[in-house]
Structures are given as structure tokens and as C-alpha cells.
């Protein structure tokens, strides 16, 4: 695991300029953005430090994962305010066996994924509806172009971990299943769009609706 983390750090540093080239955030006219209500004189190195990846990166991948579902730990400007105006962000993605990151898009950035541990099947669909897929091994990288619908799937019986870099401090996330079936679009509209019936649409919606809290 130590060698995997070393590889992760080296390639993350190398990939950072690539993410910046693809950046789409507005330029700023200062060195960095001071949060509202903060005094510049009180800012220290702590402001430019993010420690939220310590737990996922220290996980023993040979042991059962504490969460049976796909999880993501983000370092965007929401979690790491120093990224505001810097046109870069990261995420650690954890895939227990037989889990996936469902089809989704990032409207404001491409995604550069580095597989640190395990194996993944990934893919995206371009604007001509052509599907591009690849099976990744640890150490492989894959780029999902900006705005394209894409996914990652761990079909094996071992966990996988990846690091994703984005050319935006807030790349955004649009989940295709939730956006289509979880936003109260009329059942008749969806049934006609997918050439099916309303009961089928209602079943799909039910599967994406969180259970009511007691």
C-alpha cells in the first residue's frame, strides 16, 4: 500500500498542470481568494492545507471496507476554501466489490482519474453517442472529457481506490439516474421518452427515492 500511495502522490503532482490547462474557472486578480469575513493577516499555512484524505488513503485495502457502497471524499472549494480561484480540485473514490459510480457528468471540468489500487471498468459517451470503454489496472490513468456522461464499475471481488483531478475548484455533478427519475419530471413525459409505460417509470422512480425518515 505504501508504494501505491507514493505512486499516487507523484502522479497527482505531475497531473496538476494538466488539470490547470483544462481549467474553466474565472481568473482572479489576487494571489488567492480570502474568505468573506476573514482577515488576511490571520491566514497561515493551515488555510492552504487539506487533511481530509488521510483516512481513505491510510485504509488497508486487503481488509473489508467499512462501507459497502461506493463513496467519494471531495476536496473542492466547499471543503477546501483555499481552492477558490485556483481552478483545481481532487476527489478520492472508494469502490467496494461489485459497486459503481453511476453515469454522471461534470459540467465545468474534465476528470483525470488515476487508479491507485484494484481494477475498474470505465467509460464515457461522446456527443455522437459513441461509447468509449477501458479496463484499468492499478497505475493506469483515464480522462473523461468535460461534460461527457461517464461511469466507473468495480465488477471484481476486491476493492478499488482512485484519485480524480479536476480543472475546476467546483466541477459540479449531474447524476443521470437521479436527474432523470428523481426530479419530478412528469411520468408521461418519461414514459414517452423511454418508449415504455407509466408503471415502469414509477418503479424506476421508487428505486431512486430515499426512504422516508421515521
Curated annotation (Swiss-Prot):
Q: Where in the cell is it found?
A: Secreted, Extracellular space, Apoplast
Q: What domain of life? A: Eukaryota
Membrane-crossing residue ranges in chain numbering: none
UniProt-recorded Gene Ontology molecular function terms: manganese ion binding
Q: Where is the signal peptide?
A: 1-23
Keywords from the named record: Apoplast, Glycoprotein, Manganese, Metal-binding, Secreted, Signal
Q: List, for all copies, the residue spans of the domain called Cupin type-1.
A: 59-202
- Residues noted as binding Mn(2+) in the record, renumbered to the chain: 104, 106, 111, 150
Could you name the Gene Ontology cellular component terms for this entry?
Answer: apoplast
Give the positions annotated as glycosylation sites.
42, 60, 69
**Which InterPro entries does the protein's record reference?**
Cupin_1 (IPR006045), Germin (IPR001929), RmlC-like_jellyroll (IPR014710), RmlC_Cupin_sf (IPR011051)
Q: What does this protein do?
A: May play a role in plant defense. Probably has no oxalate oxidase activity even if the active site is conserved.
What does the annotation say about its assembly with partners? Oligomer (believed to be a pentamer but probably hexamer).
What is the similarity comment for this entry?
A: Belongs to the germin family.
PANTHER family named among the record's database cross-references: GERMIN-LIKE PROTEIN SUBFAMILY 3 MEMBER 3 (PTHR31238)
List the protein's name: Germin-like protein 9-3
Q: Which organism is it from?
A: Oryza sativa subsp. japonica
What lineage does UniProt assign to this protein's organism? Answer: Eukaryota, Viridiplantae, Streptophyta, Embryophyta, Tracheophyta
Amino acid at each position: 500500500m505504501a508504494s501505491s500511495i507514493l505512486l499516487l502522490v507523484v502522479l497527482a503532482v505531475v497531473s496538476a498542470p494538466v488539470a490547470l490547462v483544462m481549467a474553466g474557472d474565472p481568473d482572479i486578480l489576487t494571489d488567492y481568494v480570502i474568505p468573506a469575513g476573514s482577515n488576511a493577516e490571520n491566514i497561515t499555512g493551515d488555510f492552504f492545507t487539506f487533511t481530509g484524505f488521510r483516512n481513505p488513503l491510510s485504509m488497508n485495502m486487503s481488509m473489508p471496507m467499512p462501507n459497502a457502497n461506493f463513496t467519494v471524499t471531495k476536496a473542492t472549494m466547499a471543503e477546501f476554501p483555499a481552492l477558490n480561484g485556483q481552478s483545481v480540485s481532487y476527489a478520492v473514490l472508494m469502490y467496494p466489490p461489485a459497486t459503481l459510480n453511476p453515469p454522471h457528468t461534470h459540467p465545468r471540468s474534465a476528470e483525470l482519474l488515476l487508479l491507485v489500487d484494484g481494477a475498474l471498468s470505465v467509460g464515457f459517451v461522446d456527443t455522437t453517442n459513441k461509447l468509449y470503454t477501458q479496463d484499468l489496472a492499478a497505475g493506469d490513468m483515464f480522462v473523461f472529457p468535460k461534460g461527457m456522461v461517464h461511469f466507473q464499475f468495480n465488477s471484481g471481488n476486491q476493492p478499488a481506490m482512485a484519485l480524480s483531478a479536476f480543472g475546476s475548484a467546483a466541477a459540479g455533478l449531474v447524476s443521470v439516474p437521479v436527474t432523470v427519475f428523481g426530479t419530478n419530471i412528469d411520468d408521461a413525459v418519461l414514459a414517452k421518452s423511454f418508449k415504455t409505460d407509466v408503471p415502469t417509470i414509477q418503479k424506476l422512480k421508487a428505486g431512486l427515492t430515499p426512504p422516508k425518515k421515521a
